[in-house]
From Swiss-Prot:
Belongs to the UPF0284 family. This is UPF0284 protein Pcal_1534. Disulfide bonds: none annotated. InterPro entries: Nict_dMeBzImd_PRibTrfase, Nict_dMeBzImd_PRibTrfase_arc, Nict_dMeBzImd_PRibTrfase_sf. It comes from Pyrobaculum calidifontis (strain DSM 21063 / JCM 11548 / VA1). It comes from the Archaea. CDD domains: DMB-PRT_CobT. HAMAP family: UPF0284 (MF_01086). One of its GO terms (molecular function) is nicotinate-nucleotide-dimethylbenzimidazole phosphoribosyltransferase activity.
Length: 336
């Protein structure tokens, strides 16, 4: 099947789980993780951050995967979808009427009214996007691999310790403890909607709902991301979606991550159409890009989908990414 994207939608949101020290490196500090989704999409659309004059990086200075998505999928129209971000981006976006996610250890992730609104509006948006054909859906939500684990466990899947991390050192014990604390507080919720309300975040149900709408309109939904997309696919399935119509695209770094189990999770949920971008940054002249080969970042902002598409077009992805990397660091150093 030809999976050339007609449009690339990036769904953003936040969860207070990202404020737990050590849970994520998708931001230079825990507090800055609430800015990461806004900065990601501002950079993706404009080539520079707007809300803060800071390119989103890990604590080790490795830049956002939005750099890769922007560099290699430059010719694909982009759409920002706000599912519930604490910091709203200063670029145009579609608002699904959700709310930022809470700390699932302390209380519900969101109100069920907000989750229902996300499902309704997301599905409506998906039906419109589906008329275009192939729709790639990426995400930006620091802490999302932890809430993804919670969603999957809440829906009855064995996801313990199987979701990935933006860090080379996956904090699996900490993530599992957060999920255990959330389950102790909420008990196993009785239905999928309650699972999302109690244990999730705004992004995963939004991804699922948009994908469902795309499929209903005759389009092809492509979840472009890592282990978090197992949770989105599980919600899609629980909403009545046909998994035969759903595709998932990710990076080689996610598939090869020994601290997680991307392929196993996809198989357990029932996703059959899995595609992997085989790009390597091992020969890059830049340490920040070679770090990807050591397990840094791995996915995010639809990077796997962008790489998969670019490689299918025969593009020299490393050359494109290095050129964008050079431009970004000139901007960082000179403010130009």
């Amino acid at each position: 099947m030809n999976l050339k994207p007609a449009i690339f939608a990036v769904v953003i949101g936040t969860t207070d789980v990202s404020l737990i020290p050590g849970i994520t490196v998708a931001g230079a500090t825990p507090e800055l993780t609430h800015y990461t989704p806004a900065l990601d999409v501002e950079y993706l659309l404009t080539g520079r951050p707007i809300t803060l004059d800071v390119v989103p990086v890990t604590p080790d200075g490795i830049p956002t995967p939005a750099l890769v998505t922007r560099a290699v999928a430059f010719d694909v129209p982009k759409l920002v979808v706000n599912a519930g971000a604490r910091v709203r981006p200063r670029v145009p976006y579609v608002d699904l009427g959700g709310e930022p996610g809470g700390d699932i250890r302390r209380g519900p992730a969101m109100s069920c009214a907000a989750a229902e609104e996300l499902a309704s509006r997301g599905r409506m948006l998906g039906r419109e996007l589906g008329r275009l054909g192939v729709v790639y859906l990426g995400e930006s939500i620091p802490g999302g691999t932890t809430t993804a684990m919670a969603i999957l466990v809440g829906l009855g899947y064995n996801a313990w310790g199987r979701t990935s991390s933006a860090s080379p050192n996956n904090p699996k014990e900490l993530k599992a403890q957060v999920v255990m604390d959330a389950l102790e507080r909420a008990k196993p919720p009785p239905d999928p909607l309650r699972v999302v309300c109690e244990l999730g975040d705004p992004v995963h149900p939004a991804l699922a709902a948009i994908a469902l709408g795309v499929a209903e309109a005759g389009g092809v939904p492509v979840l472009a991301g890592g282990t978090q997309m197992a949770a989105a696919a599980a919600i899609y399935k629980a909403m009545g979606g046909d998994l035969a119509k759903l595709h998932v695209v990710t990076t080689r770094w996610i598939v090869e991550d020994k601290s997680a189990d991307f392929l196993g999770l996809m198989a357990e949920v029932g996703v059959k159409n899995v595609h992997v971008a085989t790009a390597s940054f091992g020969e890059s002249k830049y340490e920040g890009l070679r770090a990807y080969e050591r397990g840094a970042v791995k996915e995010g902002v639809g990077m796997g989908g962008a790489l998969f598409y670019a490689q299918s077009m025969g593009r020299d992805v490393l050359k494109l990414v290095e050129a964008e990397y050079e431009r970004v660091w000139r901007y960082v150093k000179r403010g130009d």
